[in-house]
């Protein structure tokens, strides 16, 4: 048997143990512990179900092969084998994918940062278009998105915007969106009808709670100030806005979206923790760098990953050579085909590495 299957029985045994614990009245009365065990069981349930079916198919193949020597039953046995053997191969591939090492961040919420880059006003407008695309995709996934920091431009775009996206397995779906996104289109301000090229960068970071990554208070410098406004009643007369600086890295975060200092500081700490963690993770040239590298890019924000060509209604993902002539639908949040292709490419590369 392939080495990857050798640990499957351990998974089955662990699943059985989890179900025994979940049936324990004491565990059922401990809501937090019960939820933790339920989540753990849910994460491996598909593996258990596929492996159970796989073992049944193996047994059915053996039974059918034993009937090949029976003249009366042989035709029926051959018919069964013609269906069972392809299913066996499909289940084996599915199990290999299910048994690939999981990214520990896959089930986390994310902080996504989008910045207008090369292209002036047009790049800021494209940053806003990307935000709308991700918002619509999030709605299709029943996720929630909220803006935690933003810097707008006079033309209605974004110099930069940071959002929190929460829901099931958000990072697993959007982690491949980090990089430089290039747009080719005729800007609204272009009078000659010429196509311009602009760029916006996207950064995707898993949301880190204190349990994952701790910011030392001694490393933080904080300032409180009044949040901006249009004047009159809109100007906050109390210093509710917060600026946090991580002194070792110089990373700075400011937050003024909330009405209270406590809420702004809490949001600022979460954003700062994710940025600092991401900074150190990218500096690590050994273990984390090897984990982060994949068939679909490094995750570096400067790496050009995708081009959106409006005149030709075309989107091209350069990492996997995928081209789709449905830009209008993709910008409307129909990102599933692109994201699924990226996930499959990543899994295929990992399987190839495993089989070396």
Curated annotation (Swiss-Prot):
Modified residues (N5-methylglutamine): 233
Gene: prfA
The protein's role, per its UniProt record: Peptide chain release factor 1 directs the termination of translation in response to the peptide chain termination codons UAG and UAA.
Record's protein name: Peptide chain release factor 1
Gene3D superfamilies assigned to the protein according to its UniProt record, in alphabetical order: 3.30.160.20, 3.30.70.1660, 6.10.140.1950
Family membership: Belongs to the prokaryotic/mitochondrial release factor family.
Iron-sulfur in keyword set: no
SMART domains: PCRF (SM00937)
Cellular location(s): Cytoplasm
Signal peptide positions (record): none
PTM (free text): Methylated by PrmC. Methylation increases the termination efficiency of RF1.
InterPro entries: PCRF, Pep_chain_release_fac_I, Pep_chain_release_fac_I_sf, Prokaryotic/Mito_RF, RF-1
Keyword Cytoplasm: yes
Molecular function as annotated in GO: translation release factor activity, codon specific
Pfam families on file: PCRF (PF03462), RF-1 (PF00472)
GO cellular component: cytoplasm
Keyword annotations from UniProtKB, A to Z: Cytoplasm, Methylation, Protein biosynthesis
């Amino acid at each position: 048997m392939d080495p990857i299957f050798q640990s499957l029985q351990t998974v089955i045994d662990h699943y059985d143990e989890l179900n025994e614990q979940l049936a324990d009245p004491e565990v059922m009365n401990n809501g937090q512990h019960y939820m933790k065990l339920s989540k753990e069981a849910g994460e491996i349930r598909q593996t258990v179900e596929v492996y159970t079916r796989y073992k049944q198919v193996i047994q059915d193949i053996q039974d059918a092969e034993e009937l090949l020597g029976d003249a009366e039953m042989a035709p029926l046995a051959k018919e069964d084998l013609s269906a069972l053997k392809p299913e066996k191969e499909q289940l084996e591939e599915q199990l290999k994918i299910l048994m690939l090492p999981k990214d520990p961040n896959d089930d986390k919420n994310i902080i996504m940062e989008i910045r207008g880059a090369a292209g002036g006003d047009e790049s800021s407008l494209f940053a806003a278009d990307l935000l709308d695309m991700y918002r619509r995709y999030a709605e299709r996934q029943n996720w929630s998105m909220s803006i935690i920091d933003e810097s707008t431009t006079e033309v209605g775009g974004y110099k930069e915007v940071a959002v929190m996206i929460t829901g099931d397995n958000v990072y697993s779906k959007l982690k491949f969106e980090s990089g430089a996104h290039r747009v080719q289109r005729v800007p609204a301000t272009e009078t000659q009808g010429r196509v311009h090229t602009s760029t916006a960068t996207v950064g995707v970071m898993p949301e880190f709670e204190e349990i994952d990554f701790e910011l030392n208070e001694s490393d933080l410098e904080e300032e409180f100030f009044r949040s901006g406004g249009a004047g009159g009643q809109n100007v906050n007369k109390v210093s509710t806005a917060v600026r946090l600086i991580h002194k070792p890295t110089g990373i700075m975060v400011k937050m003024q979206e909330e009405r209270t200092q406590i809420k702004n500081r809490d949001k600022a700490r979460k954003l700062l923790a994710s940025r600092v963690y991401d900074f150190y993770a990218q500096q690590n040239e050994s273990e984390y760098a090897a984990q982060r590298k994949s068939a679909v890019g490094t995750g570096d924000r400067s790496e050009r990953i995708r081009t959106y060509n409006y005149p030709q209604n075309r989107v091209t993902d350069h990492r996997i050579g995928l081209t789709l002539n449905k830009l209008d639908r993709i910008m409307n949040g129909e990102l599933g085909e692109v994201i699924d292709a990226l996930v499959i490419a990543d899994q295929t590369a990992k399987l190839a590495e495993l089989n070396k």
